[in-house]
Amino acid sequence: MSTVKETIRDDSESELNVWNEKLWSSEIFWRDHYDWLKSNGYLLRPRYHPDWVPSWTGTKRFPLFFEDYGAQFPLFPYNLDAIRVADGKPVMLRLADPPSVSDELKIGRLVSSGDMRSDPRNHCVQIYDTLELPEATSNGRSCIVVMPYLVPWDQVKFQTVGEVVDFCSQVFEGLQFMHSHNIAHNDAKNDNIMMDWSPLYPKPPHSHDTSMRLDWKGASKPRSRTLYPVRYHFIDWDLSKQYNPLIRTNRIPMRLPGYGGDRTVPEFNRKEPCNPFAVDVYCLGNVIREKFIEGAPIFDDYPRRNVGFMRELIADMTHDDPSKRPTMDEVVVRFEEISKTLSWWKLRSRVSDKRFPLLLHRLYSPIHCSVQLSHILRLKRAIPKHTPPKDSALPS
């Protein structure tokens, strides 16, 4: 009986390995442009080389040990990581929407240029470079934008209240910045917030599996946000719009409901015209509500301890009546006032998962306290503050 089971298992593994020796349809574009991208200074992973041969073939090692098997296809068909040949740094490539489809390029270029680029409140992902394709794709996409290599903001656990305060301060400031320029993000959901990988990770993590290093030579080892403060960024402009300031001053711009990835927006359920700026406020508030305050078990998110001080503000941001939600200017002011009331001890308190009993939280507290004492002795701030490195200037 065991021999039959082993034979079935071996056959299924063999079929899976043969299947993974082929590129997925979403990968073909990148393979076909491997040499062109290389000539423009960007190197894709070995899997996308035109003459790629699966590295696990002819070996007895388990295929998942190999990068070109374990990270076998882009998570998003129009995005792929690459290495910038000039300095060896990872970047993200994006096959952008054509202007006839969205304002993605317009908004991306706007927030990456002029005074907006240098504004410290700007948490929009920047465009490093734009590459015009030799020939447009069948759906009209004709250029690739090169952006920083970022990782999901919540991949590393938050250890203290101060780290949560820093995150909220940055994303509130970032959305306030966009709204101050009459830009509605229109999809300010959880996975459109990212963070710079470089402070937290000694080696870049893999875009497909952040638990592994980009070179697949071992596990990635994230560090503490308190010791290595990070900067958070908004991404994804394919639904974003900039409104005429005169129109916004004289009347509220409205759009039809049902856009973006957050389907819990109350106006959407009522199928009524939406104020996109009020929807943005709701969506960002809902990110924080689901990640820290109430949880969202369907997404494996659970409420955290010691974050009740945000409850009233987040409740207002996610109010059913959009006219009763605060503006982002008001959110920023209120959150600054709330933050000032938090003691140094509160800021260094744990934000542990409420799934686990309070007893476990308290049993771990002495360890947490000793770690925080070491941070205090090293003069590390209770609320981390990211300082850009001196060599962080973006290429023109």
Per-region residue spans from a language model:
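Protein kinase subdomain VIII
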Residues: M212-P222, D236-P273, A278, G285
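Catalytic-loop of the protein kinase fold
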Residues: L175-F234
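Conserved C-terminal C-lobe helix
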Residues: R304-D320
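Conserved structural core of kinase catalytic domains
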Residues: S112, M116-V171, S198, P204
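Regulatory extensions appended to serine/threonine kinase catalytic cores
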Residues: D10, W344-S396
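Conserved hydrophobic alpha-helix
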Residues: V171-M178, M317
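ATP-binding glycine-rich loop module of kinase domains
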Residues: L37-P134
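Terminal C-lobe "cap" of eukaryotic-type protein kinase domains
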Residues: H319-W345
